[in-house]
């Protein structure tokens, strides 16, 4: 499913954000590209939930949390997000790429993936997808895009 999400993001969302797309056409295009229908449907559902989160239609508790609260990860979240990923999320909060609400969106979308464990590169892509359509997060998106595509110049995080 994650490969489908990356393909969709690079092909449709990132390159043509204003374009209205027909979900049936996208499904057919993805199937023609060699993706399995189940992965395609899971990816499209994942994106629908993300859109609902971004519009505040789901999980309104995300917007009522105290921004100074400390995030304690559940056992399942710790299994899925290793120490490097959790540290990177904290780093993104410290440099204000993520706020408490967008952090929770990222964690929600990570937990909805069908992967038992997420690596740092996958996490960066999910953060980029979450930030992509949120008004007011354009600078955070640009910063995250730079972090995703940066070549290792000795940058520590």
From Swiss-Prot:
Database matches in Pfam families: DUF494
Membrane-spanning segments: none
Top-level lineage group: Bacteria
Entries under PANTHER family matching the protein: PROTEIN SMG
Family: Belongs to the Smg family.
Protein name: Protein Smg
Organism, as annotated: Yersinia pestis
Native organism taxonomy: Bacteria, Pseudomonadati, Pseudomonadota, Gammaproteobacteria, Enterobacterales
């Amino acid at each position: 499913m994650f490969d489908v999400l990356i393909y969709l993001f690079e092909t449709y969302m990132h390159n043509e954000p204003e374009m209205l797309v027909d979900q049936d056409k996208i499904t057919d295009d993805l199937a023609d590209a060699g993706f399995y229908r189940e992965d395609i449907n899971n990816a499209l559902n994942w994106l629908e939930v993300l859109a609902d989160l971004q519009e505040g239609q789901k999980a309104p508790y995300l917007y009522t949390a105290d921004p100074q609260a400390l995030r304690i990860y559940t056992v399942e979240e710790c299994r899925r997000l290793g120490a490097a990923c959790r540290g990177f999320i904290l780093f993104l909060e410290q440099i204000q790429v993520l706020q408490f609400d967008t952090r929770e969106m990222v964690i929600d979308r990570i937990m909805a993936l069908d992967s038992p464990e997420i690596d740092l590169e996958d996490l960066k892509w999910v953060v980029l997808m979450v930030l992509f359509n949120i008004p007011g997060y354009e600078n955070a998106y640009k910063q995250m895009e730079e972090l995703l595509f940066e070549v290792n110049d000795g940058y520590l995080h």
